[in-house]
Amino acid sequence: MKWSEISIHTTHEAVEAISNILHEAGAGGVVIEDPYDLVKDRDDWYGEIVELNPDDYPEEGVVIKAYLPVNSFLGETVEQIKQAINNLWLYDIDLGKNKITLSEVNEEEWATAWKKHYHPVKVSEKFTIVPTWETYEPASNDELIIEMDPGMAFGTGTHPTTVMCLQALEKYVHPGDNVIDVGTGSGILSIAAAMLGAHSVRALDLDPVAIDSARLNVKLNKVQHVVTVAQNNLLDHIDEQADVIVANILAEIILRFTADAYRLLKPGGRFITSGIIQAKKQDVKDGLLAAGFFIEEVNVMEDWVAFVAIKP
C-alpha cells in the first residue's frame, strides 16, 4: 500500500488544531517537528527519553507531517484538509507560513517514519507515557504508566497543554472523586484520573473519531471499569455533580461552558483547563471569574497556559 505524506509548515499556536484536523481526515500517524524540542530544558519535563536529530527539524516554526492512504479520494481529502486549516483564522489562530506539500512514501517507510519520533516520556512526578511498541520498566512502584498508540487519533499526549493538565490532575484528583473530562480526545486525561483513584470518570467528546480513540485507549490501559466514554456536546444535558472537571480544548470553546462547569462542580471542586494560547489568557481568566470561580493556579509551558479554578 502506498501512502502520501502531507507536510504543513505552521506555528506552535496552530499545532493542536491542525493535528486534530489531520486525524479527523483519517491520517495514519501524525509527527510534530518542533525545533524547540532541540533546546528545551529537559528538567521541565521530568527527563524525556529521546534521541533527537537536528536535521529532522525546521529552522523556525513547526512542521506537522501526517500520512494519508493513496486512493481515489486523496485529492478531495487534501482539499478538505487545506480548507479546514485555512478556516482556523476564524478562531484568531496564527497559521504562520501555512505551507502545505505532498510526497509519496511506501508502506515500509510509513511504518517507521513516525515511530522514530515517539519514546517514553515522564511528564510528571508519577506519570510516564509509553508508546505501545516500547518496552519500559518503571523506575519505582509509584510510577504510573499510560500506554498510548500514536497511530490512533490525537497522538501520545506529550503536548504542553496535555502535560499541564496531567500535572494538575495528579495534584487535585483524590481517591473516590467523580471526574468529568470535556473534549476527551485520546482519553488520556480520563485514563490518568482513573489511575489516580477516581471513583468514576465521564469522558465526553462530540467527535466520533475521538470517541473510538478514547475507548481503545481506555481498554488498552484497563480502566474501562472506571471510565465511561460518551458522545456529547460539552456539558449539555449533564446533571451529576463532579469533584474535578478537566478540559484541554480551545479557549473559545472553554468559554462556552464555564457556567455549566461551575454549576456541576461541588463546592470546593476544581475546573482544570488548558489548550489556551497566551493571547487568550486574559479572556479565559475573565470568563472564569465571571462564572464565579476563584483562580487557584495559572501555569505556563512554552506558549501555552493552564488554569486551575476552584468553586468556593
Swiss-Prot record:
SUPFAM superfamilies xrefs: S-adenosyl-L-methionine-dependent methyltransferases (SSF53335)
InterPro entries listed in its UniProt record: Ribosomal_L11_MeTrfase_PrmA, Ribosomal_PrmA_MeTrfase, SAM-dependent_MTases_sf
Record bears the keyword Transferase: yes
Primary location class: cytoplasm
One GO biological process term: methylation
Pfam families listed in its UniProt record: PrmA
Keywords: Cytoplasm, Methyltransferase, S-adenosyl-L-methionine, Transferase
Stretches of the chain forming a coiled coil according to its record: none
Reaction equations catalysed: L-lysyl-[protein] + 3 S-adenosyl-L-methionine = N(6),N(6),N(6)-trimethyl-L-lysyl-[protein] + 3 S-adenosyl-L-homocysteine + 3 H(+)
E.C. designation(s): 2.1.1.-
Top enzyme class: transferase
CC terms in the record's Gene Ontology section: cytoplasm
Positions annotated to bind S-adenosyl-L-methionine: T162, G183, D205, N248
Gene Ontology MF terms in the entry: protein-lysine N-methyltransferase activity
Cited Gene3D superfamilies: Vaccinia Virus protein VP39
Location of this chain's protein in the cell: Cytoplasm
Purpose of the protein: Methylates ribosomal protein L11.
Xref: NCBIfam families: prmA (TIGR00406)
Family as reported in the entry's similarity comment: Belongs to the methyltransferase superfamily. PrmA family.
Name under which the protein is recorded: Ribosomal protein L11 methyltransferase
